Amino acid sequence: MFNVIANGIPGTEMPGHWFTDREIRQLVAFVRTLGRVAPQKATGDVVNGEKLYAGKGGCASCHTIGGRGGAIGPDLSDIGASRSLSYLRESLTSPEAAVPDGFLEVQLVTRKGRRMTGVRLNEDTFSIQIRDLSGDFRSFFKSELAELNKQPGKSPMPSYTKVFTQSELDDLVAYLDSLRGLE
C-alpha cells in the first residue's frame, strides 16, 4: 500500500503523491484501521467452536480459513477483524439477511435440461461463470441456457438455528471472532 500511495498506479489516473515517508506510513496505518471492528468479548468457547466449524457444521466444505477449505462461500480468515459478534451470529442464524457482495446465487437450466445452482463468479454479455455447490467451476455461453435466474438476497448457506444449540452457536461465534488474519 505504501508503494501505491507513493508511486501511484502506472497506466491509471492514480498519480503518486508528494507525502513524506512518515506521512505515508501514517496514512497506511489509518487505512488499515478502516473496516476493522474493535474486539468484543465473545462468551463462547473458541476451541469447541473450531471443532464445530470443522465437524458438525461442515463449514469448511464451503468456506476457507488460512487457505484451507472450500471456495463457495466467503474467506473467513480475518472475519473477526471486520465483523461484529451480532453480525457473525446473524450470518449463522439468518444467512440471507446480509449476503456478502460477490456471492450472488444463480440458478440456471441449460437447453439440454440440466439444472444447476451456484455462486456467480463472472458474467458478461455472452457468458456466465459460476462455482456450483460442489465447488466446481462452470462456464456457460448464455445462448446455451434456457433459464438464468439471479437470486439477490438468497444464500446457499443454510440457517444453523436447528443444527446448533444456543451454546454451540456461542462457541462458533467465539471461534469466528478469533479469526483476525495477520495482525
Per-range role (PLM):
Residues 1-35, 61, 70-72, 78-177:
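Extracytoplasmic electron-transfer domains, predominantly the class I c-type cytochrome c fold
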Residues 34-42:
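Accessory carbohydrate-binding/adhesion or oligomerization-edge regions at the termini
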Residues 180-182:
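Short acidic/polar inter-strand loop motif in beta-rich domains
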Residues 1, 41-67, 80:
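Sequence/structural segment immediately N-terminal to covalent heme-attachment motifs in c-type
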